[in-house]
């Protein structure tokens, strides 16, 4: 068993070294170049038309019987991103790579804002209607419909189904079980069974119930956690400037061994920052597009904007605030505090009454919503590979069993499995994103000309088959040419 653990750890270190740095940063930078930095140039517009509409009655908050609203889609996706990656993941990055890892997490987040925008936009443009008249989409659909690469789509789905067992089930149940154990002292085996029962109750209702659940829980848990974080940062206000400076300098000249910190090389700092960066926002994995493809939206770009905001909220906002609390506490170099407890210990130091409880409760809620949301992604991967209800039921059972196993597992080994699985999803997904960048540019130009500031809406029932496929089949489209929307009603 130890040999297997060592092999997984070595493979994780290799994949999230130079290979993923190249794929994630260069691939994302290429998309920024191809889209002429559309996300950054239009960030104000994106913010006002996404989060700015959450509390208003608008197309962002409405859905029909067969779909979910954009807000429910982003809540489901955020439920899959705001979890162990934002709390335990950030602590792990700092513990292993030093404070400088957060700088590389920022770089990954800025690049990934466009990456996630791109994959969600393409997922909506290539989505289909299933036998229940519900939208289905994701990387497997733009790999097949957009590029006619069904073999690569199947490969992504296989990698995805395996990865989700680690990222969704093992990691999140591990984080949730440890949080409950910290609060109550209840045996981990009992906690695992309780997690399993609660999860079954939610996932049996499908994407509609998952979306409704996430829409209620995500805002609540975000306010709870961020509220406590802001209070602590006010307490540490005189240290914030030096903490931010430390993050930047440590990114290029990592801290040598000090206290309980073993020291880190530049590559270690980059590796842990990027790995935790992608785990905190999912960009490039191809998972979130599966939820967004089910949204009630009139245009792919309009839904893609929610993806950019997801990355900003989960990585730039939540991860940074968590990191500042940890660094200001000074506990990151304490050998007696492991990564699993680092964030809770930092909160407890600043808020002796209730600090650790807030982190444990927040992590419990974060992890459970992630656990539920990622089952949906896994089911979508299996559904693409086979229509067999028996196989889907078996996968559901395995996912549930893994949630019990994860509640008993060691943290480092669980993270290593997840890192390897995530890498196997990234590669085929980026092949699709790069090769379909021309179609992505067309979709942006179509949105800019016909919908962005015109007040017009597209058709909420447009799919790849009845509208967007006409774009993807024009192999010799000139980038400067903008097509008028096709009218299929006349």
Positions of PLM-derived features:
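Helix-loop-helix module between adjacent transmembrane segments
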Residues: 31-32, 108-133, 139-174, 178-203, ...
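Flexible loop linkers connecting adjacent transmembrane helices
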Residues: 37-68, 92-102, 106, 114-147, ...
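N-terminal alpha-helical transmembrane segments of multi-pass membrane transport
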Residues: 1-80, 84, 95-101, 112, ...
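Membrane-interface loop-to-helix entry segments
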Residues: 23-30, 34-47, 174-180, 187-248, ...
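Extracellular/periplasmic helix-exit of transmembrane alpha-helices
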Residues: 117-127, 230-246, 254, 258-261, ...
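Alpha-helical membrane segments and immediately flanking helix-loop junctions
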Residues: 58-96, 122-140, 144, 158-161, ...
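Transmembrane helix-loop junctions in multi-pass membrane proteins
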Residues: 3-4, 34-39, 85-90, 166-177, ...
């Amino acid at each position: 068993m130890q040999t297997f653990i060592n092999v997984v750890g070595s493979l994780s270190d290799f994949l999230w070294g130079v290979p993923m740095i190249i794929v994630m940063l260069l691939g994302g930078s290429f998309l920024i170049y191809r889209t002429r930095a559309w996300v950054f140039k239009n960030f104000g517009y994106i913010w006002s038309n996404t989060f700015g509409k959450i509390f208003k009655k608008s197309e962002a908050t409405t859905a029909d019987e067969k779909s979910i609203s954009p807000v429910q889609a982003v809540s489901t996706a955020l439920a899959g991103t705001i979890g162990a990656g934002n709390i335990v993941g950030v602590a792990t990055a700092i513990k292993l790579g030093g404070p400088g890892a957060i700088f590389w997490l920022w770089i990954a987040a800025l690049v990934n804002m466009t990456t996630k925008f791109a994959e969600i936009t393409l997922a909506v443009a290539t989505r289909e209607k299933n036998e229940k008249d519900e939208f289905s989409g994701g990387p497997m659909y733009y790999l097949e419909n957009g590029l006619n690469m069904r073999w690569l789509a199947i490969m992504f789905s296989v990698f995805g189904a395996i990865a989700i067992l680690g990222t969704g089930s093992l990691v999140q149940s591990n984080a949730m079980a440890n949080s409950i154990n910290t609060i109550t002292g209840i045996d981990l085996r009992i906690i695992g069974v309780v997690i399993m029962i609660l999860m079954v109750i939610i996932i049996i209702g499908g994407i509609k119930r998952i979306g409704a659940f996430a829409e209620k829980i995500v805002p609540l848990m975000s306010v709870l956690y961020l509220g406590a974080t802001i209070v602590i940062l006010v307490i540490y206000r005189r240290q914030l400037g030096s903490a931010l400076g430390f993050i930047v300098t440590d990114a290029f000249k990592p801290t040598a061994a000090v206290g309980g910190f073993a020291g880190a090389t530049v590559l270690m700092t980059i590796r842990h920052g990027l790995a935790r960066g992608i785990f905190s926002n999912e960009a490039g994995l191809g998972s979130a597009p599966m939820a967004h493809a089910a949204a009630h939206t009139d245009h792919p770009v309009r839904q893609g904007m929610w993806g950019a905001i997801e990355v900003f909220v989960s990585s730039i906002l939540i991860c940074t605030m968590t990191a500042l609390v940890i660094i200001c506490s000074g506990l990151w170099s304490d050998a007696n505090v492991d990564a699993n407890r680092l964030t809770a210990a930092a909160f407890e130091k600043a808020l002796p009454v209730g600090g650790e409880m807030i982190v444990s409760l927040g992590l419990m809620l974060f992890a459970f919503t992630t656990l539920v949301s990622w089952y949906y992604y896994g089911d979508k991967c299996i559904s693409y590979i086979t229509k067999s209800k028996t196989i889907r039921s078996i996968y559901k059972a395995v996912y549930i069993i893994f949630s019990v196993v994860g509640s008993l597992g060691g943290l480092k080994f669980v993270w290593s499995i997840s890192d390897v699985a995530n890498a196997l999803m990234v590669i085929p997904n980026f092949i699709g994103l790069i090769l379909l960048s021309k179609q992505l540019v067309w979709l942006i130009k179509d949105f800019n000309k016909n919908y962005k500031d015109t007040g017009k809406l597209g058709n909420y029932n447009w799919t790849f088959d009845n509208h967007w496929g006409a774009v993807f089949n024009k192999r010799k489209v000139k980038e400067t040419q903008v097509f008028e929307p096709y009218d299929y009603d006349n």
